[in-house]
From Swiss-Prot:
UniProt family annotation: Belongs to the staphylococcal/streptococcal toxin family.
Keyword match Signal: yes
Record's protein name: Exotoxin type G
Keywords on record: Signal, Toxin, Virulence
Signal peptide coordinates: 1-24
Function: Mitogenic for human peripheral blood lymphocytes.
Molecular function, one GO term: toxin activity
Name of the gene encoding the protein in the UniProt record: speG
Species of provenance: Streptococcus pyogenes serotype M1
Length: 234
């Protein structure tokens, strides 16, 4: 009798553990599908455009381009205090990921605004190292291309994710990757981390994923030392 009870307990534990693993696996697949959909997007990318007006938490930009016979504007939502750095009439560069496509003549983004600089068409190159379960390889220079002296973490993050999606299929539902991080290192030994799997986000939507860019974190290309990407399969 005791043997039968013990067997039942063991089988129940095994079944429960197996169910938990299956549930976690489905959650990871849902997360990957959502991230693949979110980042499979054409960014708002404009150079030398003008700020129409600013509010306490938004920057409204006139792109001088037309869509649906109307002038196309970009409305960037930012954290409090960010708009103190900009005024009406400033020339800026925009690189942001739209999370809302209504109305059709306004692209809504979070952050993604830097003062315009005449960098020309020269692509900046950064040293990158990919670490997969402890195995390191240097990344090719085309892993991320940026043509501005100043750029936002949003632009760098997006371009790294696109590279990893195209070359390593990190967000494919059946891919072996379970977690990953991007570390951007500056020459003063500071590191800025981005969770490439957004595991702290409760809602699997573009709005939720892109809201992290509200801080409009800006880097000067001359300050960058290198970047590291860590991908894990277990």
């Amino acid at each position: 009798m005791k043997t039968n009870i013990l067997t039942i307990i063991i089988l129940s534990c095994v079944f429960s553990y197996g169910s938990q693993l299956a549930y976690a696996d489905e959650n990871l697949k849902d997360l990957k599908r959502s991230l693949r959909f979110a980042y499979n997007i054409t960014p708002c990318d404009y150079e030398n455009v003008e700020i129409a007006f600013v509010t306490t938490n938004s920057i409204h930009i006139n792109t001088k381009q037309k869509r649906s016979e109307c002038i196309l504007y970009v409305d960037s939502i930012v954290s409090l205090g960010i708009t103190d750095q900009f005024i009406k009439g400033d020339k800026v560069d925009v690189f942001g990921l739209p999370y809302n496509f209504s109305p059709p003549y306004v692209d809504n983004i979070y952050g993604g605004i830097v003062k315009h600089s005449n960098q020309g068409n020269k692509s900046l190159q950064f040293v990158g190292i990919l670490n997969q379960d402890g195995k390191e390889t240097y990344l090719p220079s085309e892993a991320v291309r940026i043509k501005k002296k100043q750029f936002t973490l949003q632009e760098f993050d997006f371009k790294i994710r696109k590279f990893l999606m195209e070359k390593y299929n990190i967000y494919d539902s059946e891919s072996r990757y379970t977690s990953g991080s991007l570390f951007l290192a500056t020459k003063d030994s500071k590191h800025y981390e981005v969770d490439l799997f957004n595991k702290d986000d409760k809602l699997l939507s573009r709005d939720s994923f892109f809201k992290r860019y509200k801080d409009n974190k800006i880097f000067n290309s001359e300050e960058i030392s290198h970047f590291d990407i860590y991908l894990k399969t277990h």
